[in-house]
């Protein structure tokens, strides 16, 4: 939020006329009471002759690729200045700001007389951006008639001695997105009297301004309307108002629109102006209907959803509530009668709609943070009086003031009871008696003391004050957090990492050492990802948990698998030229269960009971820890040693074994079919008899639909399904020599090599130290649908030197066990 210091000082000075602090001091004060000051911008500096001029004559130059104008400008001298200008948003008679030769504009831009486009240009007509007043380069700055006379000091007229505070307002402090809120904060910080600019004299009320109906459950808390008729369509906003809007980052357009923006900045209440003569029948507030569309003020037709809240008349949509007006009731250049609207919308509804439609606005930002419903009519009256004063016309005494629930006294949140010394006890600081009551009264709360207890009714603009802790925070920040001692809490002796944490770190290190790069995956699923994978409707991964207020409207579902985020990252990397990619992620997924219940509300002013904690646990979906990896491109790089090798399913299987070794468990792989993997190159991973995940090459159809490189491989394991091994056994080292033997076994072609290896290991017993498959052979001499697997066996005893007969006996036992388990025959 951009705030001109001169305007802020004026609002504060209404209650403290002598208040005047330097901008640098005010910056530190705002930071001290909890506000984030992103930047303090000093306007200018402009050195040299900057003056107000009046355009007396314009000659359009032709023969150039863009419009060029040769202007005569009266700058108060005896002779008009000749200036070449490329802007077209002004006419003869307009007041402009002229930088004469010798002027240096912000950014070090020096102005000199020069010949350009075949004419002599004796200065420059300036835009707001060139003067450092904003970012608008669309045309030169045209001053309203009567602002100044030609030859007047341009720097003084523009107020270039001002300072702009750029603040980052946190979501819980929406009241500070206004001069009213910030001035109150400053008054609290300096113990000044505060005069509320929202305390305006009410305008007369006689009858209803406009028929209005509001559909239930739309979340509207208040809706006020007042007409202003007979305004002059040729009127323009005065310079003082345009300047304040410009310095606040808003471009002036017309008086009706300008005054709504001005009151929004001043009081924090967004407003909207409708052309009264373009409204057909009564107004209504309702949800959008399926398939309904609206053309907004930017002339774009937008598709609406049934959750969008609209303002409608009998013929068309008049506005998207809290987001943007519709073209049907837009105030235009010939409008003479306007209907001013001040409404309070549901913050969640506004946030959801503006995100989905990509329509962020100053009004929507304020509605998202909460708007004070108590000042709707005051803001409406302030706006109407300003408009009538600027553009003429008559403010109607008719007023529509619809109030929803709750409409309690003052529109305030519920009262809160708090021990008067609670801030002292929580901060460890002894504050003077009455400090809590004083500070809470300063922020606008109604405070009643009864012994040692304060009953506090928060003000209507502070919906964030809900419990004693919130009140304590207000007292502490206004008293200054710097007075709280910096004492480190005494921590209990550390117990180190848990077994699960140690395992997680070991897995991450092992994958990194194997060439994988870790990513931090987003917890939300991309829209339609499971349709791209071709998952059936009853696949458990489709059973997702939906977030009510997602960061992105098109990603409201929490991830049940890590692969979508990894594959998105892989596509992004490949699109940027990184074709050999190996990524992994370690994170939780969210898997709803049939037993998941609604979350029970538990107060935060006490520790939950064991029963309440059990209910909370039961209401949560499963959140197991998963590890997943994806890889594509070359797994072994090309070089003098060879052409390199592309990643394949075997690399995904090896990554599974890397994870298993880090976790201290043995895994088995068996052929399986599971989307999005290729049915012939997918393995189910088992620990004991428990399935823990899948690995292999992705299905070609999925690869094509998802825009992935050909041959992309992936794996995903559920770490929570893998038992924890508290202490990994140390490797057994034998000082005795090993005996090496090979064995070739013939099995059916559809028997997995892993099944044969498992049988060999089981049959060979403890003497078998290592087994490696090093050859697979098929041929007519083996018979149809048969294959030969050759293993290298390494035998070693821990307590003696093995003989060849010992190793042969163990090998023969392994062959017998393989024959029993998978029908293997010894190849001779």
Swiss-Prot record:
Instruction: Identify the residues that the record assigns to the tRNA-binding domain, covering every copy.
Output: 44-155
GO: which molecular function terms?
ATP binding; magnesium ion binding; phenylalanine-tRNA ligase activity; tRNA binding
Q: Where is the FDX-ACB domain?
A: 734-827
Residue ranges of domain B5 in the record: 411-486
What is the annotated localization of this protein? Answer: Cytoplasm
**GO cellular component term of the entry, any:** phenylalanine-tRNA ligase complex
Write down the superkingdom of origin: Bacteria
User: A biological process (GO) annotation for this entry?
Assistant: phenylalanyl-tRNA aminoacylation
Reactions catalysed: tRNA(Phe) + L-phenylalanine + ATP = L-phenylalanyl-tRNA(Phe) + AMP + diphosphate + H(+)
Cofactor or coenzyme needed: Mg(2+)
Look up the EC number in the record and give it. Answer: 6.1.1.20
* Subcellular location, principal: cytoplasm
Do you know which PANTHER family this protein is assigned to?
PHENYLALANINE--TRNA LIGASE BETA SUBUNIT (PTHR10947:SF0), PHENYLALANYL-TRNA SYNTHETASE BETA CHAIN AND LEUCINE-RICH REPEAT-CONTAINING PROTEIN 47 (PTHR10947)
Q: What is this protein called?
A: Phenylalanine--tRNA ligase beta subunit
């Amino acid at each position: 939020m951009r705030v001109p210091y001169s305007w802020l000082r004026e609002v504060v000075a209404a209650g403290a006329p002598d208040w005047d602090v330097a901008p640098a001091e005010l910056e530190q004060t705002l930071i001290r009471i909890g506000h984030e000051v992103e930047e303090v911008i000093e306007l200018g500096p402009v050195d040299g002759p900057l003056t107000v001029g009046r355009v007396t004559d314009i000659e359009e130059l032709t023969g150039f690729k863009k419009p060029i104008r040769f202007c005569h400008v009266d700058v108060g001298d005896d002779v008009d200045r000749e200036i070449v200008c490329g802007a077209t948003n002004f006419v003869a008679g307009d007041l402009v700001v002229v930088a004469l030769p010798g002027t240096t504009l912000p950014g070090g831009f020096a102005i000199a007389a020069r010949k350009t486009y075949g004419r002599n240009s004796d200065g420059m007509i300036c835009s707001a951006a060139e003067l450092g007043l904003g970012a608008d380069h669309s045309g030169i700055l045209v001053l309203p008639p009567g602002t100044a006379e030609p030859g007047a000091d341009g720097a003084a007229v523009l107020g270039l001695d001002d300072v702009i505070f750029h603040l980052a307002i946190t979501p819980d402090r929406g009241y500070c997105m206004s001069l009213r809120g910030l001035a109150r904060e400053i008054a609290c910080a300096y113990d000044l009297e505060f005069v509320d600019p929202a305390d305006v004299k009410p305008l007369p009320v006689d009858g209803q301004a406009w028929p209005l109906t509001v559909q239930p459950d739309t979340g509207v808390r208040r809706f006020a309307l007042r007409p202003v008729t007979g305004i002059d369509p040729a009127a323009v906003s005065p310079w003082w108002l345009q300047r304040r809007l410009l310095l606040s980052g808003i471009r002036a357009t017309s008086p009706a629109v300008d005054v709504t923006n001005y009151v929004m900045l001043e009081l924090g209440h967004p407003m909207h102006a409708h052309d009264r003569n373009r409204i057909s029948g009564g107004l209504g507030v309702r949800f959008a209907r399926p398939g309904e569309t609206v053309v907004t003020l930017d002339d774009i037709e937008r598709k609406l959803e049934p959750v969008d809240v609209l303002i409608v008349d009998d013929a068309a949509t008049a506005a998207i509530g809290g987001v943007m007006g519709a073209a049907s009731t837009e105030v235009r250049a010939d409008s003479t009668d306007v209907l001013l609207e001040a409404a309070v919308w549901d913050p969640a509804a506004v946030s959801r709609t503006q995100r989905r439609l990509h329509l962020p606005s100053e009004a929507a930002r304020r509605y998202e943070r909460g708007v004070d419903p108590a000042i709707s009519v005051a803001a409406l009256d302030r706006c109407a009086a300003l408009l009538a004063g600027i553009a003429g016309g008559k403010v109607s005494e008719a007023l529509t003031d619809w109030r929803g629930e709750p409409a309690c006294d003052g529109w305030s949140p519920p009262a809160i009871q708090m021990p008067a010394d609670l801030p002292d006890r929580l901060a460890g600081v002894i504050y003077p008696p009455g400090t809590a009551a004083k500070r809470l009264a300063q922020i606008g709360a109604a405070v009643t003391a009864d012994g040692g207890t304060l009953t506090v009714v928060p003000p209507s603009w502070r919906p964030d004050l809900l419990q004693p802790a919130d009140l304590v925070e207000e007292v502490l920040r206004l008293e200054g957090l710097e007075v709280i001692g910096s004492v480190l809490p005494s921590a209990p002796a550390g117990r180190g990492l848990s077994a699960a944490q140690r395992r997680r770190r070991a897995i991450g290190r092992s994958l990194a050492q194997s060439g994988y790069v870790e990513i931090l995956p987003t917890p939300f699923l991309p829209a339609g990802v499971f349709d791209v994978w071709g998952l059936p409707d009853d696949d458990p991964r489709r059973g997702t948990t939906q977030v009510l207020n997602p960061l992105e409207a098109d990603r409201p579902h929490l991830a049940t698998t890590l692969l979508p985020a990894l594959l998105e990252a892989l596509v992004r990397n490949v699109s940027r030229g990184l074709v050999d990619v190996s990524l992994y992620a370690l994170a939780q997924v969210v898997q709803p269960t049939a037993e998941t219940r609604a979350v029970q509300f538990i107060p935060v002013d006490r520790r939950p009971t064991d029963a309440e904690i059990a209910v909370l646990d039961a209401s949560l979906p499963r959140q197991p820890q998963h590890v997943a990896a994806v890889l594509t491109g070359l797994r072994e790089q090309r070089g003098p040693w060879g052409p390199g090798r592309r990643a394949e399913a075997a690399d995904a299987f090896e990554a599974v074994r890397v994870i298993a070794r880090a976790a201290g468990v043995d895994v088995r792989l068996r052929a399986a079919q599971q989307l999005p993997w290729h049915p012939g190159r997918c393995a189910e991973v088992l620990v004991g008899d428990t399935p823990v995940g899948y690995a292999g090459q992705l299905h070609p159809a999925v690869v094509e639909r998802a825009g992935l490189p050909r041959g992309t491989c992936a794996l995903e394991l559920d770490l929570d399904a893998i038992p924890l091994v508290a202490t990994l056994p140390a490797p057994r080292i034998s000082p005795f020599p090993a005996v090496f033997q090979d064995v070739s076994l013939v099995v059916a072609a559809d028997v997995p090599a892993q099944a044969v290896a498992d049988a060999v290991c089981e049959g060979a017993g403890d003497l078998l130290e290592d087994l490696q498959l090093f050859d697979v052979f098929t041929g007519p001499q083996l018979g149809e649908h048969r294959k030969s697997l050759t293993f290298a066996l390494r035998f070693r005893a821990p307590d003696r030197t093995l003989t060849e007969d010992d190793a042969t006996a163990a090998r023969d036992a392994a062959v017998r066990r393989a024959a029993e388990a998978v029908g293997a025959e010894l190849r001779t």
